[in-house]
């Protein structure tokens, strides 16, 4: 925590990654304690992500990381997993602040992913490459001459609100970076200009789209969008999300697989638990009893297939009878929150819903095992720390050297 960048957000230095697993946990503890020390780093992060070059100012969504410490120059590669967590945190932040700036970025990003990130199966693909025609960022950047020729006198609106210049900010070209909040009197003119630029950009050759639909990421995305639709009271988003859930259900009707396009890829813990999380969220939103039953079945299957009786935790790969060695224990939050913490969260929900003691018993097993390994993994286990607090409200969380008990 002492390495937080108090000006630009996330951690100090470059390259710079959003580290959503940490800031999601931090915002959870802010909502619980109202301690502004937890709120401020999240606000700084989201302000910077939404206004700088890492955010696609024309279409929405963020790139995987920035090469500089001020988020100006992105690596341009767009990943589904990052943006799921970006949408989730933006939703929570908007719900708390009611700041329309963040709502607009949230809606723009959702629209982008629903329009541009779906494959021919109408599921979400995995990523867009950083380069097109062999040049990194070519699809996204603008020369000053190009902007001047396209916009004529209207370029003044762009110059007033975005950091553009003849020298540019990326290899002689310009990445759109907001200067400040756009005045109400210029919003309409600027929106027209941005739409004009977007229409021109869409005529360019796009970066390569990796259209592989991964079960864990699709389930996670749909679960987040389902929650967002409820929080925003957006029936259209809810309806479209449920339509996509039905497509995913059909694909996984016979067997849970990691990648529909390549069934040879091994299935992982996260494929099971994120699908179970989606199903229980669908039950919470729509009182869909079949979804609840499916969630319970998936959770029981997960216990049978992935639970390691020696470590008393889940391993990433399915345990086979003829395995000579157990897979290494993986408790880190990497691209997405760890499957162990997701299982703990769902079992806590299932115990509240069903009052079946099997879920509280499994919770106790996981919590006990977690406490035995936390000192080795804590810096990468923020989703687990957050989930444990949801389950028992008994953790102590430290910020800038001062310990605050969470009851």
What do these predicted ranges mean?
Residues 1-407:
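Glycan-recognition and catalytic cores of secretory/periplasmic carbohydrate-active enzymes
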């Amino acid at each position: 925590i002492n390495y937080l960048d108090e000006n630009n957000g996330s951690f100090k230095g470059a390259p710079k990654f959003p580290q959503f697993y940490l800031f999601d946990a931090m915002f959870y503890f802010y909502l619980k304690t109202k301690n502004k020390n937890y709120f401020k780093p999240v606000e700084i992060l989201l302000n910077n992500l939404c206004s700088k070059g890492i955010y696609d100012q024309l279409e929405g969504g963020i790139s995987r990381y920035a090469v500089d410490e001020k988020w100006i120059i992105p690596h341009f590669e767009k990943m589904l997993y990052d943006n799921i967590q970006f949408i989730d945190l933006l939703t929570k932040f908007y719900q708390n602040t009611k700041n329309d700036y963040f709502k607009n970025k949230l809606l723009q990003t959702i629209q982008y992913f629903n329009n541009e990130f779906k494959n021919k199966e109408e599921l979400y693909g995995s990523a867009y490459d950083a380069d097109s025609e062999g040049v990194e960022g070519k699809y996204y950047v603008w020369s000053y001459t190009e902007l001047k020729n396209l916009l004529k006198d209207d370029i003044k609106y762009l110059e007033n609100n975005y950091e553009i210049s003849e020298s540019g900010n990326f290899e002689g070209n310009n990445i759109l970076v907001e200067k400040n909040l756009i005045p109400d009197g210029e919003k309409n003119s600027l929106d027209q200009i941005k739409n004009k630029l977007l229409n021109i950009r869409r005529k360019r050759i796009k970066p390569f789209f990796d259209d592989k639909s991964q079960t864990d990421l699709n389930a996670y995305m749909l679960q987040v969008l389902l929650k967002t639709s409820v929080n925003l009271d957006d029936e259209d988003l809810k309806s479209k999300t449920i339509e996509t859930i039905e497509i995913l259900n059909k694909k996984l009707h016979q067997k849970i697989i990691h990648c529909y396009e390549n069934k040879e890829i091994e299935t992982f813990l996260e494929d099971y638990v994120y699908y179970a999380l989606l199903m229980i969220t669908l039950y919470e939103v729509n009182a869909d009893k079949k979804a609840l039953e499916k969630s319970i079945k998936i959770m029981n299957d997960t216990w049978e297939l992935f639970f390691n009786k020696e470590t008393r935790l889940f391993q990433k790969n399915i345990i086979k009878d003829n395995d000579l060695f157990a897979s290494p224990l993986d408790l880190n939050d990497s691209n997405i929150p760890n499957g162990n913490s997701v299982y703990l969260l769902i079992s806590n929900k299932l115990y509240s819903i069903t009052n079946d003691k099997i879920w509280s018993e499994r919770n106790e097993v996981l919590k006990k095992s977690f406490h035995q390994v936390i000192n080795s993994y804590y810096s990468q286990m923020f989703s687990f720390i957050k989930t444990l607090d949801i389950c028992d409200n008994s953790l102590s969380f430290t910020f800038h050297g001062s310990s605050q008990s969470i009851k």
